[in-house]
């Protein structure tokens, strides 16, 4: 979709990855060449640019972050199966989902994008990179993926949240890439009551540290990971900068959308039942 009057166009990274070139077709039939401005595999976002927008073409307005609610009607626009300019309607089925990084090698295997929107609006091959709109015509997400065993819509589609557009796209335009914060930790995704007992924790809410990289910001800050043999003894993160953390996804959302490399954050942890505050200076994601 058209992002601004300078001719920047937002799409999915996986749509343009590996392509020698890309062109865009506007609703009036104008077909224009583009140049790649920036791309980010971890969020599956990319920005293209045309030299000048056709007359009458205007950018789509972005919704405010966190304005979407479960049950709200949304409209998906794209080119499913090559059918240009198709629109489909559905509801927001869920919020706070996550998508794995599009990068296939290296340490990025453990990275994921938080805050992803789940919708039952039909999303099929060709919808990728198109906007997900609210009924006010504002962009609330970028259609990215479907959960299906057949490769076509099964009522479970996923869209990158608009907060990622607010946070990441300006960096892609200015410097061609987005630099994420990095702690050097791996966590249990969510803790069940059984996990609480297994790990010897006093509560099940929080992000439990399973391992940390030697020499990482987390290691230098003095955080503790679980014993690899017993699974016990790791720190349980319960708040960051005063914001409660109920699970890893909430911690990941804070890091991805509200922090920057070089920033020092205050992490509240439970260690052997005792509440501690640990200062950690964030690094850059490899």
Question: Residue locations for each model-derived region?
Answer:
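Conserved PDZ fold ligand-binding element
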Residues: 1, 9-13, 220-248
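Surface-exposed loops/turns
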Residues: 214, 260-261
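Immunoglobulin-like IPT/TIG beta-sandwich domains and homologous Ig-like subdomains
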Residues: 240-243, 254, 258
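Serine-dependent protease modules
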Residues: 1-205, 248-256, 262-263, 273, ...
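Edge beta-strands of extracellular beta-sandwich domains
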Residues: 278-281
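PDZ/PDZ-like domain micro-motif
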Residues: 128-129, 192-198, 212-236
